[in-house]
Amino acid sequence: MNAVGAHTIRASTVLPARRRDIELHTADGLRLVGELALPLERDPVATLITLHPLPTHGGYMDSHVFRKASYRLPALADIAVLRFNTRGTTSDRGTSEGGYDAARDERFDVAAAIEFAEFAQAPALVNRWLLGWSFGTDLALMYGNDPAVEGAILLSPPLKFSGPEHLQGWAASGRSVVALVPELDDYLRPDEAVKRFSAIPQARVIGVEGAKHLWVGEPYLRRVLDEIVATVRPGFGPLPTTWHGDVASASVIAPAKKTAL
């Protein structure tokens, strides 16, 4: 822990929070491992239920955007961050039971995460939003259209596993959908994303100039976090780039060499 003072927030900066290991239990009998990061001294005003990129291409609960969200958002914006490994996925936290099922049985994983957040107490996890990245956006669109969530924030959505029927379901629900689409994405770029997401009248597509699928680089990471906060806590932000108080430092995990679909 570094001494109290003004610290520039960097990729490795870990701000104060209450962090605890959690387990999710799926309807088909699996145990999934995860972590919940909460504001240190206050109850959260919003909750992010994160759905990570494709585990066969390096995605897991520690994928860098989600890891840094858990490092920063509880302290900077009073937002709780729930991260977990989908079935068969491994991180430092451990390995979730089961095996990757190409967005089929992962429906049970999404349901277990939503249920955990919905019924959490001390503190209650209010104002719940899904935050998917790549493969995780497909899981959000396919299985996250649930009355217990306010909406979905989609990072680099490829629209690979999800289909028109899932977009239609979100359209009918009226729940918020916000898609952050990198200008230089490998799978779906902003102009095409606008066309595809027009099936959801309430959806907002935000193109991010210069960004790529993996959101590598502090400027792009900050843009993502600012857009998340603006969505789940309107009128709050942009996030500060310095912190006055104690901080810790974590090892920096390089993004996966494979494209994290």
Per-segment meaning from a language model:
Residues 99-120:
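Alpha/beta-hydrolase active-site loop
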Residues 2-42, 46:
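N-terminal cap/lid segment of alpha/beta-hydrolase-fold proteins
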Residues 160-161, 183-188, 213-214:
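Acidic catalytic loop of the alpha/beta-hydrolase fold
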Residues 40-83:
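Short, surface-exposed "cap/lid" segments of acyl-processing enzymes
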Residues 173-174, 178-181, 185:
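Short beta-strand/loop motif that positions the catalytic acidic residue
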Residues 165-167, 188-198, 220:
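Short alpha-helix in the alpha/beta-hydrolase fold that links the catalytic acid
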Residues 211-223:
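Catalytic histidine-centered segment of alpha/beta-hydrolase-like enzymes
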Residues 131-140:
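Gly/Ala-rich beta-loop-alpha elbow adjacent to hydrolase catalytic centers
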